Amino acid sequence: MNSKVLNTLEYQQVKQQLAPYLVSATGQQALNELHPMTSVADIQRALDETNDGAEVYRLKGGIPVARLADIKPHMKRLAIGATLNGSELGQVGRVLRTTRAITRFFAELLEDAPENDIRHLFDEVAELVTLPDVTKRLATAIEGDGHITDEASPELSRIRSNIRRTETEIRNQMGHYTRGHDAKYLSDPIITIRNDRYVIPVKAENRSRFGGIVHDQSASGQTLFIEPQAVMAMNDRLRQNQVAEKQEEQRILEELSNLIAPYQDEIINNAAILGHFDFINAKARYAHDMKATEPAVSPQNEVYLRQARHPLIDPRKVVANDISLGTDYQAMVITGPNTGGKTITLKTLGLLQLMAQSGLFIPVEAGSRVGVYNEIFADIGDEQSIEQNLSTFSSHMENIESFLAQIDAHSLVLVDELGAGTDPQEGAALAIAILDAIGAKGTQVVATTHYPELKAYGFNRPDTINASMEFDEETLKPTYRLLVGIPGRSNALDIAQRLGIPQAIVDQARSLTDTDSQDLNAMIADLVTKRKQVEDEQLHLKTQVADSEKLHRQLKSEFNAYQQRKDQLIEDAKVQANTIVEQSKTKADAIISDLRKKQLASGTATVKENELIDAKGALNALEQQPKLKKNRVLRRAKAQHDFHEGDDVLVKSYGQRGVLMRQMGKHEWEVQLGILKMKISDGDLERVKPEEPKRARATVQSAHASHVSPNLDLRGVRYEDAMTQVDRYIDAALLAGYPSVTIVHGKGTGALREGITNYLKSNRQVKSFHFAAPNHGGNGATEVQFK
């Protein structure tokens, strides 16, 4: 990608926004190397990595990468046999400890959420080498700031213990001078150090009162820093221990340097992976804070940005716009007055395309697509060079001339105020010729202009569409909303009239304007008004649909709760009834037992044994069975709704027979209807007797193939009715055995087309779908292939 367009579209400013999210030197290096890519595979991989990072951020708040310095220079020194200092070893140790922490983090993540697909990150984690023994040794010996710990070696611990003990002895001894009767002979009652030896500040005139050695004096000569005779031996011992400490520390540094030397490549690779994780972290957090989403990548350069926002404009002020290119048209001409937002729209398209090709999420709504351009060329009005002594027109022409020789079918051209800076008539003619030249090479182009002549261009040229920026006639201010399909209209006379210019002057100006221009402006104004009405109606319908769906969910939830409560009450009543029956049985058993005893005692048998058994059986029959298996009153009705896998059933709402595959909920079953599997409520099912196979096949063939058409025409049908028809039609077509069908929805506002597209995406029986060929309806019809 040429560097000029990166500057023009402010790509570097996006990188500057991303920089504060990084914590490692290697991550910063990855940001410095960030650039737009032109390979679909490379772009998709980078986007997948960002998506993985976003998923980890959602689950765990991000990958725990610590602040890491650049250790490559240390490894280069190590490679030539140098000994690393404490600070360098501390930084290497931090890399190894972070490596261990990251490995554990992903192991726990895999255990906690094995269903999450973040394979790109797991692949990189698998390349990390933890080196547990080396990590432990460095952690024990070196602190993060490079300080060598007492635990680095037993000898160092012993030496430092001697140093601390000797320092205590010296301070205790010298405390006699600073706190005793000799304190009055000192300049200050303190203990200090000169030439690595403990001394006291003595007034010069009292020199003779203290033995020892003078190590220094003050600038005025009034104070002498004397090492008293009493501590000289202790200072000597302290100094010897300090020398031994330095020698032991140097030995430890050499030992640790030799310890990590064989693992230079592994440590460098670990640092690179950690830096990459840091960069992925930064991309994910940046996307989260910017409310950005992952776009789909279109190798055919079919761009569709839903509610695109410029990332460098204050989120509280930025206006979102839908921008599309490459599907229904290859060129867009945005007309209208200045300061309406045309330039920002150009920059938004270009910058978001650069960001996506760099693997960054972009500030758009879900469902957006970006292209893959080998080059993007931009001629934006505010980047003209005055210091080169070029006029606006000349600068424009130089820019355009430079990219006309380079563009092809894989390029995107963005031109601001095409043909500006010269005679309007000639400028408009030149602009049309330039657009034709760009279109002849198959290059996609978005151009802005205020020339009215180019309004007709969008109507007359194939694969070209007009657009404009909306203007609020009430406030006399631009709204910065892009209106695709509507050319810009001149508002100068209306604005002048509203701002108080005398009516006579405005009327005279209108009379001087040719009739065609007035008619065109009136037509555009009418289009804008009707578009606004349609958008308002759409918004109203969406609100109604959302409210209806919410109400439906509430009613369904309440109905399910009612069903559960009803079932529970029935079960409770059965339990209570069974308790009563059980109590009665107990009493009856006692009575029968008593009767038997009396019969045996009297030797008579007035009540036969089989009669006793029958009476007891009748009592048992009173017990309420929870499953109703023995309740003769409800058994027949229950049998039709007692479902099991493999049962033949009738789906009442479709009038079709099917087979139960599996239970999916308390009141829902998966039913096989021909080649179609559907989730059906048990209230819509009735168990039936199996039919003969031949008879069943004949029923399917005759019931559907005879009256289901391979085409569904929805033109003129309201949105809600159309979506209902589509749902039923797809089911019927599948049952009829059609491999594919065509849905004719017309072009219109695109709302029905979008609704059908979303439905087909969510239908598991749909293999693929696409717009029909131009001679079969184009984007006014959708062809659907089934699995």
Swiss-Prot record:
Q: Which family does it belong to?
A: Belongs to the DNA mismatch repair MutS family. MutS2 subfamily.
- The EC code for this enzyme is 3.1.-.-, 3.6.4.-
* A GO molecular-function annotation: ATP binding
Q: Which GO terms describe its biological process?
A: mismatch repair; negative regulation of DNA recombination; rescue of stalled ribosome
Q: Which gene encodes it?
A: mutS2
Q: What is this protein called?
A: Endonuclease MutS2
Q: Does the keyword DNA-binding apply?
A: yes
Q: Where does ATP bind?
A: G336, P337, N338, T339, G340, G341, K342, T343
